[in-house]
């Protein structure tokens, strides 16, 4: 279980439940299939394993792993529009009258209800790691909407979840621009070969560089003309590489072979053991990586009143 993306949230108070109570709370809102007339459902699933006996909260040392699943019926808008247009034209031709908005909306609703049972089903899962001692929740997603779906559902079943996005004192854009300009990143961080540059004014240009030498004159020229770095590929120590963006989202996480080999050795031959070992090693690595990243970005910013 290696995360590929990272949205970082700070628990502003202690988690109000332990693993056992969290399991019981999550069991009140399990993932389930969409009924014939439902567009979407959302609930919790076991992060590892299947079946009724698989725990909803995987505990490994001081860390917890949870997962939620969204199921939705995919009804293409073009299909609904075509059916609506055909039905409206049929009514107007047969009854020799115009169909106005209120009736059109009613017809549209009827079409959607008729098509729903035949719509395709799409399922997507979101994983999150909870580190109570560090006061962090880490969501394996680059989408704030998907993260908020999970966190709000967790808040619903627990009753409270005092959490906010982790913020830093210096804008990531300023730090990343400085690293590329000076070619001197923070200790243990290494600039790789990919970045996105943007003009600071709203309608300005965007330059995306891939497999480029970011120390080149071409890149430096863009920076001297006022562009800033809004995404930057980086490596940390010899353990992982990632893409950092201006909102402090960590994308495209890739753990180096050394860590993956160690997890494979620690996990033994069973699939569950492999998953547990990789999750544990990942979280221990984050225990060093995330404080280093926050420090490199000027330290954590605590909003006033918290």
From Swiss-Prot:
Q: Does the keyword Cytoplasm apply?
A: yes
**Entry GO CC:** bacterial nucleoid; cytoplasm
Which Pfam family is one of those matched by this entry? RdgC
- Protein name according to UniProt: Recombination-associated protein RdgC
Gene (name only): rdgC
Location in or out of the cell: Cytoplasm, Nucleoid
What would be an example GO MF term here? double-stranded DNA binding
Cross-referenced NCBIfam families: PRK00321.1-2, PRK00321.1-3, PRK00321.1-5
Origin organism is Pseudomonas fluorescens (strain SBW25)
Q: What function is annotated for this protein?
A: May be involved in recombination.
Biological process according to GO? DNA recombination; regulation of DNA recombination
Upper classification of the source organism reads: Bacteria, Pseudomonadati, Pseudomonadota, Gammaproteobacteria, Pseudomonadales
Q: Which family does it belong to?
A: Belongs to the RdgC family.
Q: Quick check: keyword Oxidoreductase in the entry?
A: no
Keyword vocabulary terms for this entry = Cytoplasm, DNA recombination
């Amino acid at each position: 279980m290696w995360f590929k993306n990272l949205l970082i949230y700070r628990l502003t108070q202690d988690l109000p439940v332990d693993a056992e109570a969290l399991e019981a709370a999550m069991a009140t809102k399990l993932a389930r299939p969409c009924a014939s007339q439902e567009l979407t459902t959302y609930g919790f699933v076991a992060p590892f394993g299947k079946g009724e006996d698989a725990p909803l909260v995987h505990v490994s040392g001081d860390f917890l792993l949870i997962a939620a699943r969204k199921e939705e019926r995919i009804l293409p808008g073009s299909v609904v529009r075509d059916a609506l247009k055909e039905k409206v034209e049929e009514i107007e031709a047969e009854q020799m009258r115009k169909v106005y908005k209120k009736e059109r909306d009613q017809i549209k609703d009827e079409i959607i209800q008729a098509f729903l049972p035949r719509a395709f089903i799409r399922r997507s899962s979101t994983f999150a790691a909870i580190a109570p001692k560090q006061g962090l929740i880490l969501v394996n997603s680059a989408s704030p909407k998907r993260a908020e779906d999970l966190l709000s559902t967790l808040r619903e079943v627990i009753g409270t979840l005092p959490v906010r996005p982790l913020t830093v004192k210096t804008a990531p854009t300023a730090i990343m621009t400085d690293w590329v300009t000076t070619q001197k990143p923070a200790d243990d961080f290494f600039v790789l070969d990919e970045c996105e540059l943007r003009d600071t004014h709203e309608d300005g240009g965007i330059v995306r560089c891939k497999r480029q030498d970011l120390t080149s004159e071409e890149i430096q020229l863009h920076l001297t003309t006022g562009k800033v770095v809004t995404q930057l590929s980086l490596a940390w120590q010899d353990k992982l590489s990632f893409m950092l963006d201006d909102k402090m989202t960590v994308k495209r996480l890739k753990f180096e072979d050394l860590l993956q080999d160690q997890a494979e050795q620690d996990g033994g031959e069973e699939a569950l053991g492999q998953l547990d070992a990789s999750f544990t090693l990942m979280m221990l690595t984050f225990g060093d990586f995330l404080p280093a990243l926050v420090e490199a970005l000027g330290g954590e910013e605590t909003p006033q009143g918290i």
